[in-house]
Structures are given as structure tokens and as C-alpha cells.
Regions:
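A glycine-rich beta-to-alpha transition motif near the start of alpha/beta enzyme domains, typified by
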Residues: 1-123, 170-289
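Flexible, glycine/proline-enriched loop segments at strand-loop-helix junctions
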Residues: 83, 131-133
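Short, solvent-exposed secondary-structure boundary/capping segments
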Residues: 124-131
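C-terminal domain-closing interface element
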Residues: 136, 142-146, 150-155, 163, ...
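Short, conserved active-site entrance elements at the starts or edges of catalytic domains
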Residues: 141-147, 192-197
Length: 289
């Protein structure tokens, strides 16, 4: 693979390589994704996003969204695996579409494997309606508040709560005796029972009313500086533990890469707001030259 155009961007330092494919001819292989995402031998990123017309997507369920969204966010994790979507990535994707004139106006839809995502420009940058954040409130969770056990490397076993934001998450709130910065996330935390599709794991420290800090280990990537859907999952779980009502709809989520805002809407969806920055354009030659 030679002469591949790309754009590099990030949302709160969760970084991505965007690959435009306006004719739908280059379905990236796992090896190509891993090579592009490699921080030493490639461009470097937490994920790779192919920018392709929705009508040319391989998946019929995605193509069905073409009447409402012109562009499909074909998201891949850094290890080459296919993912449903990425919250921070949707903002970077939106910034790219607007810069290139592929979308116009302050509000439009993006097609993803997790369904349509509505984007609008706001003072912070971009706000994306990610749909419902579904807390797994099955019987065990209703009784104890938890339905998983999470063990970070070298740390104690901690209770966790599963949340679905179009992709899987397990949220852990830290006890006062454990500092967020002390966690070793250099290896994937052990989660039991382990979901068959894997899970992102968010560790949360409560800073105040409607204000949390978070670190995340993303499936297929490792620890990242930010995770948009993870911020939504963390806010949704903390809100559920608090008792969700009209007084705790807006949450500030501090991540190592910056700050995000999560708002739970009247429609029962979660809106994620934050910055998106495009930092470079180039041609990747796969080491040639």
C-alpha cells in the first residue's frame, strides 16, 4: 500500500488517522490499520477512521442509513479490529467533513455501525448525540449496584457496572483510599464475567456534584488519553448510582487529555461535547522512499 492520503486529528488527545475513501475502493485490512496506527513505524493513533460514502459501505445495515447520513465513519481499533463507533472520533470525523466541504451547516448526521449519530457545532467544538446509555440494571445490579468484578494489575478487586453506549463498557468507581493516578493500566484489567465481545473499562473518581475524573483502558487499544463513549458510560453509571433525576443531567468529565461534557437529554439520550482538532495532512508511503 503506497501513497495513501491521510489526516491526523484528536479529540481531547484521543487521536486518530483518517483515511478518505470517496469511491469506497479501499477496505483497510487489519494489517494496514495496525501499520497506520503504529506510533513508531506508522502515523500513530488510537484508531483509524475510513471516510467513505454511506451508500458504498459493505454492511447493508449501514447502507440503510444513507438517506439520512451521507458519510460513514468506518472505525477500526489500533489492533486492527473493527469497532462499532468512537465518541471522540465522531467529533474528529465531523471536523474533517466540515473542513473538506463534505458537510455544511451547523448540524448533520454521521453513519456508524452503532446507528446514526447527530452532530452539531457548539462553543466547545462539537456535540454528538450518542443515543441512549443503557446501564445493565439486571437483577444483580439492582440488588448490589454492580454486576462485574474488575482487577487492575497490582490493585485490589473492585466492583463494576456494565453500560452499553453502542459499544461495551464496565465502570468502576474508586474508593477514597485508592487514587486514580496510582492505577497500573499498562495491561488490560481483568473483568469477570468477561463479555464475549470484550469491554472498555473506566475507572472513576468522584470530584463533586456532577463532576468526575476518569481513566480508561480501551479494548483493542490499551490506555488512552480520553474516550468519549467511556465518558458517557462513566457519567451514566455514576448518575445511576446517585439516582438519576432532573437535577443531575449534566456532567463534567476530566480525562488526562482534557475535559468533556455529558448531558442526558429529555429524549433519554446522552450528548457528548468537546473539542476536535485536525493537526496534520500527509501521504503515507508505508515506509517506501
Amino acid at each position: 500500500m503506497h501513497g495513501l492520503a491521510f489526516t491526523k486529528g484528536h479529540g481531547t488527545e484521543n487521536d486518530f488517522v483518517l483515511v478518505p475513501d470517496p469511491e469506497g475502493r479501499h477496505d483497510l485490512t487489519p494489517d494496514e490499520v495496525r501499520a497506520l496506527a503504529d506510533r513508531r513505524a506508522g502515523v500513530g493513533g488510537d484508531g483509524v477512521i475510513r471516510v467513505v460514502p454511506t451508500r458504498l459501505a459493505d454492511d447493508p445495515a449501514v447502507r440503510a442509513q444513507s438517506g439520512q447520513a451521507a458519510w460513514f465513519m468506518d472505525y477500526r481499533n489500533a489492533d486492527g479490529s473493527v469497532s462499532e463507533m468512537c465518541g471522540n472520533g465522531t467529533r474528529v470525523f465531523a471536523a474533517y467533513l466540515l473542513r473538506e466541504g463534505l458537510e455544511r451547516g451547523g448540524e448533520f448526521a454521521i453513519a456508524t455501525r452503532a446507528g446514526l449519530k447527530q452532530v452539531r457545532t457548539v462553543a466547545q467544538g462539537y456535540a454528538v448525540d450518542l443515543g441512549a446509555a443503557r446501564v445493565d440494571d439486571s437483577e444483580g445490579a439492582r440488588e448490589t449496584g454492580f454486576n462485574a468484578v474488575v482487577h487492575a494489575h497490582g490493585g485490589p478487586e473492585l466492583p463494576g457496572l456494565r453500560v452499553d453506549v453502542g459499544n461495551p463498557h464496565t465502570v468502576v468507581v474508586l474508593p477514597p483510599t485508592l487514587a486514580l493516578g496510582d492505577l497500573d493500566l499498562s495491561v488490560a484489567p481483568h473483568v469477570a464475567p468477561h463479555p464475549s465481545a470484550g469491554t472498555n473499562v473506566e475507572f472513576v473518581q468522584i470530584l463533586g456534584s456532577g463532576h468526575i475524573a476518569m481513566r480508561v483502558h480501551e479494548r483493542g487499544v490499551g490506555e488512552t488519553r480520553s474516550c468519549g463513549t467511556g465518558a458517557v458510560a462513566a457519567a451514566a453509571a455514576t448518575r445511576w448510582w446517585d439516582g438519576a433525576d432532573d437535577t443531575n443531567r449534566e456532567w463534567t468529565v476530566d480525562v488526562p487529555g482534557g475535559r468533556l461534557t455529558v448531558t442526558f437529554t429529555d429524549a433519554g439520550t446522552a450528548e457528548l461535547a468537546g473539542p476536535a482538532v485536525l493537526v496534520a495532512d500527509g501521504i503515507w508511503t508505508d515506509g517506501a522512499g
